[in-house]
């Protein structure tokens, strides 16, 4: 879908593009609701959204623009807190590598543009090549906390943050 109408409880497709990472954003909202209210319906909704991401093939990355990092965060957090077995690396790679089926090229820069170092910025890695500060800040806000749930990512996330600060 392109969007979800919460009032009508139906997905919406604008016949131009799809944003499959909306499942990640919705999963995050539902998980936080479960933590706050304790109602299992929120956890069940989280699991449905995460199942969509988990069952999607690696080659069909879901990162459209801003929500997938929240799904990657949840994969790491739920694996730590609930003992789930979500494919953390697959979801994290979707946030970085730029190989996404619905917005190919969207990921994290690993290069210089002429004399400018753009390593770590989030945006379009292929074709036009452009990056956005707010997308970068949002991705950092979603992914830095994963080191709390899986310290094995601390070095990698730290290196990415160092590049952002450069």
Description of each model-found segment:
Residues 47, 132-134:
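Amphipathic, non-transmembrane alpha-helical scaffold segments
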Residues 22, 64-65:
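Extracytoplasmic catalytic/substrate-binding loops of multi-pass membrane glycan-assembly enzymes
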Residues 1-17, 67-85, 108-132:
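Carbohydrate-binding/catalytic loop surfaces
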Residues 1-10, 35-61, 86-121, 156-166:
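Long, well-ordered core segments of solenoidal/helical folds
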Residues 14-17, 24-38, 69-83, 127, ...:
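Well-ordered alpha-helical scaffold segments within catalytic/enzyme domains
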Residues 15, 19, 61-62:
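Alpha-helix N-cap/helix-initiation motif
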């Amino acid at each position: 879908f392109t969007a979800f109408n919460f009032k009508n409880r139906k997905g919406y497709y604008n016949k131009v593009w799809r944003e499959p990472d909306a499942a990640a954003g919705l999963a995050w909202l539902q998980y936080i609701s479960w933590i706050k209210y304790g109602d299992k319906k929120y956890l069940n909704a989280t699991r449905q959204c995460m199942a969509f991401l988990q069952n999607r093939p690696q080659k069909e990355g879901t990162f459209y623009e801003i929500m997938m990092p929240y799904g990657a965060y949840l994969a790491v957090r739920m694996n730590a807190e609930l003992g789930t077995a979500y494919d953390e690396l697959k979801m994290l790679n979707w946030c970085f590598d730029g190989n996404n089926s619905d917005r190919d090229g969207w990921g994290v820069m690993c290069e210089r543009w002429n004399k400018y170092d753009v390593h770590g910025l989030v945006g379009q890695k292929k074709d036009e090549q452009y990056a956005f500060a707010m997308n970068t800040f949002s991705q950092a806000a979603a992914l830095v906390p994963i080191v709390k749930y899986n310290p094995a990512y601390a070095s990698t996330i730290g290196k990415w943050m160092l590049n952002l600060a450069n």
